Regions:
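Sec-dependent N-terminal signal peptides
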Residues: 4-13
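A beta-rich soluble binding module of mature secreted/lumenal proteins
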Residues: 16-175
Length: 175
């Protein structure tokens, strides 16, 4: 019985670490330029962020070489901030924008960065297009609470080309 449960667990978890066929992680990724605070500009709807506005993510280096993750958003329904702490690790080499992230014990999901921009500040990336394990998970993150319309259009175009249902994007309010 334990062996069967282990096999099922491995099968289920491996499915969470995949990525859509059409998505390829960025190469030449530099973690130091990714650390810090990001604002959620757009996303596809999913239960763990439903109803949240002013969503942000903060990434910092862990002592074991991984990444500490703090996601935060305001729930209008509950009139309070909600926060989730997690951890992320590179799936392959650290120069590839492909990480696994966990907010609950040993269960990891894919975090695939498929587009980045440094903008004028070479010290940090300015926006990131991110996919999860399948085409139901998609985010546009930026260093500022708003971005130029051209960035949003690029995100929509690149995401649509990769099979994401961009007509279902949500644009959470940022203050």
């Amino acid at each position: 019985v334990k062996k069967i449960l282990l096999i099922i667990s491995v099968f289920l978890l491996s499915g969470c670490l995949g990525m859509p066929e059409s998505v390829k992680p960025v190469s030449g990724f530099e973690l130091q330029k990714y650390l810090g605070k990001w604002y959620e500009i757009a996303r596809l709807d999913h239960s763990f962020e439903r109803g949240l506005s002013q969503v942000s993510a903060e990434y910092s280096l862990k002592s074991d070489g991984g990444v500490a993750v703090i996601n935060r958003g305001f729930s209008e329904a509950d009139n309070e901030w909600q926060e989730a702490e997690g951890k992320a690790y590179f799936v392959n080499e650290d120069s590839e924008g492909y990480l696994k992230v966990s907010f609950f014990g040993p269960f990891y999901g894919s975090y695939v960065i498929f587009e980045l921009d440094q903008g004028l500040d070479s010290e940090s990336y300015q926006y990131a297009f991110i996919s999860g394990p399948n085409s139901k998970y998609l985010w546009l993150l930026a260093r500022t609470p708003s971005v130029e319309p051209a960035v949003i259009q690029k995100f929509i175009d690149m995401s649509k080309e990769r099979g994401f249902k961009t007509e279902n994007l949500i644009y959470p309010q940022q203050k």
